[in-house]
Amino acid sequence: MSVLAAIAVLAVLILVHELGHFVAARSQGIHVNRFSLGFGPVLWKYQGAETEYAIRAFPLGGFVGFPDDDPDSDIPPNDPNLLRNRPILDRAIVISAGVIANLIFAYMLLLAQVGFVGIGQASQPGVSIQQLAPEVSAVATNAGLKPGDVILSANQKEFGTSLQEIEALRDIIKNSPGKSIQLTVARGDERLSVNVIPEAKPAGGSIGIGLAPNGKVERRPVSLSKAFSVGASEFQRIVVMTFKGFGQLVTNFGETASQVAGPIKIVEIGANIAQNDTGSLFFFAALISINLAVINILPLPALDGGQLAFLLIEGLRGKPLPNRIQEGVMQTGLVLLLGLGIFLIVKETTQLTTQLEWVQKLFQ
């Protein structure tokens, strides 16, 4: 059932996003005629007083429909409660509410992670070298480092038991291309001093190692008062990490484009977590929720950020762009996004080891 659990996580995050739009509109008295979770054929629907609620066959998507675009609507075109007739601020609140809902939900998930499941900590201080990657960089191999070595400090910065120490070491390496880093390394009972000079790569310094926590990872829940601060710290870290990732995609597209994950890959990662480490599902969901928020706020056609960009232009011009221009831009963006989605799905499906294994995971 691990794949179903991962799909359920994605469906919930999409539901939260669309609920943000829906609640923001209804709370302002704006007409909403459709609320749908998923795309494709309708599996279930309910007609409310004004809104049709539906669940569709493919859960990795959803939408909130407004009668503004419905030619069969009985609502007069000049009705003040149509979305298009509302002031710019009201429309901006509705458009941005999905992103805000995803961010709030992500923070709540992180609170649950640290307060109930606990924070992961290694049983011993330091960062373990899990493997060498000479095909990426031969620096570590040439320096004599070996799998199983434990890095205790880098440039006199000591590493404790927190799982964030791995990221701290990566940052030191990434930010020091061509500069000497003095490592204190434990190999059995020995203490070694190893000097490495990270090789300059487009994404920063690299020495060609894979890192892991040192020893068994244990989770320890924190008090409620501490959970808020720790959750906020984790939230900030993930948001910054996400924006950095998108920044690298723009500045170094050739090397980072291959790391972009589509829905198949995300479900595969989520299924592995659900099967092997269910305690990390909250963190996984928070990470995807923040990514969903950041992606949607980008000023790209067919995304929330693109619609906000149109509102900004309208505010500066004093009137909206002609409908034909807006529709042309949005349709072009939608085609490009659908094309990218189909490409990622096809690529990731072919990369699965075998379709039989993938189907079998549905029942594990």
From Swiss-Prot:
Domain of life of the organism encoding this protein: Bacteria
Any one GO molecular-function label of the UniProt entry: metal ion binding
Coiled coil residues, start to end: none
Enzyme class: hydrolase
One cellular component term from this protein's GO annotations in UniProt: plasma membrane
Active-site residues, record numbering mapped to chain: 18
CDD domains reported in the protein's UniProt record: S2P-M50_PDZ_RseP-like
Membrane-traversing stretches: 92-114, 281-303, 329-346
Ranges of residues in domain PDZ: 103-188
Cell inner membrane listed as a keyword: yes
Main location: membrane
UniProt family annotation: Belongs to the peptidase M50B family.
Protein name: Putative zinc metalloprotease all3971
Organism of origin: Nostoc sp. (strain PCC 7120 / SAG 25.82 / UTEX 2576)
